[in-house]
Amino acid sequence: MAKLVYGLSQSLDGYVDHMKLGPPVPEAFHHFIELVRGLTGLIYGRRMYEIMRYWDEDLPDWDAEDRDFAVAWRSQPKWVVSRSLKSVGPNATLVADDFEKVIRRLKAELDGEILVGGTVLAQSLAEAGLIDEYRLYLRPVVLGGGTP
């Protein structure tokens, strides 16, 4: 049975605006590369998936670690929970209806860890009792506002 893990990066004052947090420090980024390499898959809400689609690109200014993360991310199966998206990118499956049922099935059929990305989706999954573990990553910044 797979374990559903919600990982959340937040500022020291408790906000989760990923665009304002900026990139992680190199040590943390290396951790995330290894984390993604070891996953069974990723489940995203629409907004977080749209942010993470960045890694489907191949940008000339990327360094070796950026490329390593992109390769790891692209290799993992992804499930995207959205009623508004009509399609998703490579190695991704759109989940438009009855996402709780789909996620319960994934947990039952797969082994390892499935990472959840997106605050709105995580709240729904938590209310349904589907998240098995929470991981909080504190970023050494104070944002002063945003999504708590």
Regions found by a protein language model. Give the residues of each.
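Enzymes that bind and transform nitrogen-containing heteroaromatic metabolites
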Residues: M1-P148
